[in-house]
Amino acid sequence: MLDKILSELITLTVDVGEIIMSHRKNSGNFSMKSDNTPVTQADKESNELIMNTLKKLTPKTPILSEESSNIPFSSRKSWDEYWLIDPLDGTRDFIDGSPDFCISIALIRNHYPDFGLIYSPFNKVHYYRLPNQSSIKVAGNKPHKISTKKPNRREKIVVGRYSNNNKPLKNHLRSKTNFETFKLGSALKFCLIAEGIYDYYPKFGRCSEWDTAAGVYILEGAGGTVLDLNNNPLTYNFREDNLSPAFKAAGYQENLKDKSTAAISFVTEPIEI
């Protein structure tokens, strides 16, 4: 099913991206939601187009979106399959004029992602993964497989631009050497690890499930891994609050047992938060 509608989903994200980019000059106009996160007109219009299109493409598949997430757990806990979307991931980055925002669409089956599509409207780049296939990057209409890379001597750790909970990482790396840290918004962090630009991404606070699902599936399809702090894979639609636990994402799995490296150790060693 997904391979048959992939081109339509890619076209959808391009159209949504144009909506988002048309609002960049007015990105400072936003309101705050009940969970104290910002929402813009771009979020709302993007959500409407994605929801309407998915309902036409897959009318029997329910949809859970950041901008329409008030579906009680009692109603959705029986879902075996559903779309999980963030129509504008990185709203704060968008508001602040950063290019680090994206559109994130995942299909969840039996509590795990089974399809992921992320589009960067600013860079006009797609990342996607079909079920049980390798992850693909599309830039300039040219698709190619991507894969994580073995870290160089200076490992590259990427964290959220607005993260206030990096103290555990700083404490953990205090005795380590040969690493650099970078700040980047949205689920694009998963994609850039998937193509070998960064090596690791620790998230020591909880975040919404629509923030992780597509990125997790894409990173895993490029050779990476994402685990919670108990070293278990992330699961979906088990919680009323739709929040993923703290996690750690790594690109190069073959090096997971080498605890001498700076950042890879946080994938294999327990970390107190």
Label each PLM-derived region with a short phrase:
Residues 141-153:
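Conserved beta-loop-beta connector loops within the AMP-binding
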Residues 134-144, 254-259:
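Short helix-loop capping/hinge motifs at secondary-structure junctions, enriched
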Residues 150-273:
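An extended, acidic
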